[in-house]
Swiss-Prot record:
Belongs to the DNA mismatch repair MutS family. MutS2 subfamily. This is Endonuclease MutS2. The gene is mutS2. Gene3D superfamilies: 3.30.1370.110, P-loop containing nucleotide triphosphate hydrolases. HAMAP family: MutS2. Residues 707-782 form the Smr domain. It comes from Staphylococcus epidermidis (strain ATCC 12228 / FDA PCI 1200). GO terms for biological process: mismatch repair; negative regulation of DNA recombination; rescue of stalled ribosome. Homodimer. Binds to stalled ribosomes, contacting rRNA. It comes from the Bacteria. NCBIfam families: mutS2 (TIGR01069). Keywords: ATP-binding, DNA-binding, Endonuclease, Hydrolase, Nuclease, Nucleotide-binding, RNA-binding, rRNA-binding. Its EC number is 3.1.-.-, 3.6.4.-. ATP binds at residues 336-343. SUPFAM superfamilies: DNA repair protein MutS, domain III (SSF48334), P-loop containing nucleoside triphosphate hydrolases (SSF52540), SMR domain-like (SSF160443).
Length: 782
């Protein structure tokens, strides 16, 4: 896409806002490289990539990327034999630390979601290398500014010797400094350092009283810094130890640099991935500031931007407009008052296209749709080269000529005040001719104009639609609302009347323009009202359709999870059953062995075929395929509404609510209502009522089969549970559902422990996915 277009649309300002949201130079470099793509797959991938991170950013607290920095120059230097210092090694360490923290965050999120919700990020995380050993080595040997003493045994030994020798020197010099006879001879009673040697400040006139080496003097010459002979050898020893320390330090740094060199490829991958993560998070942060949404990209040409607004304008005052090229429309002509928002509309459309094709979420409501353009061309007034001594018309025309030379069917062209700056009749004719030409090219076009001739242009050409910006005659100011499909109308009479012009003059003027034009203006006014109403209805309809689709997708997903969960439970039960049968078979083999021994040794009258038959009866119990009860009954039970039945495929009891034809029935199992085949139902006998004493209860209310404890405090929940179970027993319920939610699991644990001890509870289990999953406990009452 031409840089000239990006400059006109102020895309660099958008990039600067995104750059402000980055943490590292790596992220800022990615922002600077950001440019609109034109390949469909690339654009869609970039948008999905940004949308994934935005979803995560809006739901979770992301780990900090602070300290992330570019390390590729350091890795290169390490690879060619250079030695990295401690600060540079710490930059390497921080990169590894940042990537490990982010990967840990992602793995925790993956564990919570129990599935891969973000495939693009998942792929990036899989590409992150394992650099634990390198991190450990650097972390154990380098602190923020230097090597740790324990970086090696040799270094620790050398530094220990330096410390002990320094202590002896200090003690020696302290004795000299604190000697009463030396107080007047010293400039200050301190020990200081000159040229890496411990010295004392001696007044120049007392030089002869101190045997030693002069290393420095004050600017005035009145103080000499002397190293007494008593510490010269110890200072020499420290110098030698410092040299040894430097050698050992260099050896350790060389060793660590070698580890960096060995992991050079992995470090470059980590740098690339984490730089991209920083870049994507910056996109997500910026998207939040503009309430950006993800558009859907279409192979066919389309533009639908519900309630779009210009992201560089003040969000509190900017007016959002729906911009749409409906059906086969290829050209939209906008008319309306000057400063009414026509140019802003052009720039909004162009900038949103550029943002979307750069992988940025766009400032519209959900549900936007876009096709992908190879180029966006602009001829917008405030960009013209007036300084080149060209007239306004010449400047426009020079730019238009360049556009017409390059545009094709994959282009979007934005014309501002097409044909302006010359004779109105010639300008209007040129404008229509130019529009005819670009229509033949197949480009999509949006143009603004103040020529009334162009209002009629759309009525005798296919694929052309009028639009206008609204003007409020009550306030005598533009509303900046865009009305798609409605041409601009003259407001001269209304404005004149508002300003107090005589009605006689206005009525006389109306007779001069004829009834046809008056009727057209009235028709346009009616269209304005209808357009605004239809626009809002379209947005609301899109929202409802989108919500319905989301609900459908969520239910489909939950149903699939339920099926998977049911399958896993069945397989688990199958495995347990098989293990029990195996155990029983093994035990039977042992019994058979003992029986044979009895027969052989004691002459027991036991026949072999009887033993084999008994063993086969046990073998027949072994279930090799599935535990699910696919029971094929030779004769189906006669089922009626109100019958109590056992659902064979699930092993659960229920009540028939109604029959659906001759083959299906609606069955209530607890809180779940399902349509099931009659062949899957087995009629059960209703339990006989035990004779009980009649207890009269006043104002008794019918209680539900479930108790919702969400929001209760722990003690309150258990008290409520006790009362509910008593009422459920009195109501002869066989099974009830306790809803405690998932949360931290504390309430679930408390409820289940309480049920274990409760006298009225036979047993309990966790809820199936279709019953509420882990957020529900199902209790069977005695």
């Amino acid at each position: 896409m031409r840089q000239k277009t990006l400059d006109v649309l102020e895309f660099e300002k958008i990039k600067s806002f995104v750059a402000d949201e980055t943490i590292s130079d790596l992220g800022r470099e990615k922002v600077q490289e950001m440019a609109p793509a034109s390949n469909f797959d690339t654009v869609e991938f970039q948008m999905n990539e940004t949308d994934e991170i935005s979803q995560i950013y809006n739901k979770h607290r992301l780990p900090s990327l602070s300290g992330l920095a570019k390390v590729s120059p350091l890795v290169h230097r390490a690879s060619i034999g250079g030695v990295l210092n401690v600060g540079e090694l710490n930059r390497i360490k921080r990169l590894v630390q940042v990537q490990n923290q982010f990967k840990t965050f992602y793995n925790q999120m993956l564990e919570e979601d129990e599935e891969v919700k973000y495939p693009i990020l998942h792929d990036k995380m899989n590409h992150l290398p394992i650099l634990t050993d390198l991190f450990k080595e650097i972390n154990e040997k380098c602190d923020a500014h230097d090597l740790f003493d324990h970086a090696s045994y040799t270094l620790q030994s050398i530094r220990s010797k330096i410390s002990r020798t320094n202590q002896r020197i200090r003690q020696n010099l302290d004795r000299i400094v604190k000697n009463q006879g030396n107080q007047k001879k010293l400039s200050d009673a301190i020990v200081t350092v000159r040229n890496d040697r411990n010295v004392i400040p001696v007044k120049a006139e007392y030089r002869q009283d101190f045997n030693g080496i002069v290393h420095d003097q004050s600017a005035s010459g009145q103080t000499l810094y002397i190293e007494p002979n008593s510490v010269v050898e110890m200072n020499n020893q420290i110098s030698r130890l410092r040299n040894d320390e430097a050698v050992e330090r260099e050896r350790i740094l060389t060793e660590l640099t070698g580890l960096v060199s060995a992991e050079s490829d992995a470090l470059l991958v980590a740098e690339s991935v984490m730089g991209q993560i920083d870049f994507l998070i910056a996109k997500a942060r910026y998207a939040r500031t503009i309430k950006g949404t993800k558009p859907t990209f279409k192979e066919e040409r389309t533009i639908y931007l519900p309630n779009a607004f210009h992201p560089l304008l003040d969000k509190d005052t900017v007016v959002a407009n729906t911009i749409e090229f409906i059906d086969d429309v290829e050209t939209v002509i906008i008319t309306g008052p000057n400063t009414g928002g026509k140019t802003v509309t052009l720039k909004t459309l162009g900038l949103i296209i550029v943002m979307a094709q750069s992988g940025l979420l766009i400032p519209t409501l959900d549900g936007s749709q876009l096709s992908i353009f190879e180029n966006v061309y602009c001829d917008i007034g405030d960009e013209q080269s007036i300084e080149q001594s060209l007239s306004t018309f010449s400047s426009h025309m020079k730019n238009i000529v360049e556009i017409l030379q390059d545009a094709d069917q994959n282009s979007l062209i934005l014309f501002d005040e097409l044909g302006a700056g010359t004779d109105p009749s010639e300008g209007a004719a040129l404008a229509m001719s130019i529009l005819d030409y670009v229509r033949r090219l197949g480009s999509l076009v949006m143009a603004t104009t103040h020529y009334p001739e162009l209002k009629a242009y759309s009525y005798n050409r296919e694929g052309v639609m009028n639009a206008s910006v609204e003007f409020d005659v009550d306030t005598l100011s533009p509303t900046y609302k865009l009305l798609m499909g409605v041409p601009g109308r003259s407001n001269a009479f209304d404005i004149s009347k508002k300003l107090g012009l005589s009605l006689n003059i206005i009525n006389k003027a109306k007779t001069m323009i004829g009834t046809d034009e008056q009727e057209i203006n009235a028709m346009i006014e009616s269209l304005e009202h209808n357009s605004k109403r239809v626009d809002q209805q379209r947005i609301e309809l899109d929202r409802l359709v989108r919500e319905a689709q989301e609900t459908h997708d969520a239910l489909s997903k939950q149903y699939q999870q339920y099926q998977n969960y049911e399958k896993s439970l069945m397989e688990e039960a199958k495995e347990k059953a098989n293990q029990r049968v195996k155990s029983a078979t093994k035990e039977a083999d042992e019994i058979l062995k003992e029986l044979r021994n009895l027969r052989d040794h004691k002459g027991a009258e036991v026949k072999e075929h009887e033993l084999i038959d008994k063993k086969k009866q046990l073998d027949d119990q072994y279930e090799a395929k599935s535990i699910k009860q696919h029971v094929q009954k030779k004769k189906y039970d006669t089922i009626h509404a109100g019958d109590e039945v056992k659902v064979l495929s699930y092993g659960q009891k229920g009540e028939v609510l109604e029959l659906v034809g001759n083959e299906e029935a609606v069955v209530q199992m607890g809180i779940i209502k399902m349509k099931l085949p009659i062949e899957d139902l087995e009629k059960t006998k209703k339990k006989k009522e035990k004779p009980t004493k009649m207890v009269t209860r006043q104002n008794r209310q019918t209680i539900k089969t479930e108790l919702d404890l969400r929001g209760y405090r722990y003690e309150e929940a258990l008290n409520e549970l006790d009362q509910y179970l008593d009422q459920a027993v009195l109501s002869n319920y066989e099974q009830v559902y306790i809803i405690h939610g998932k949360g931290t699991g504390a309430l679930q644990k408390g409820v289940q422990q309480h049920l274990k001890k409760h006298k009225s509870v036979r047993q309990f289990r966790g809820g199936m996915p279709n019953e509420g999953g882990f957020g529900v406990t199902v209790a069977e009452l005695k």
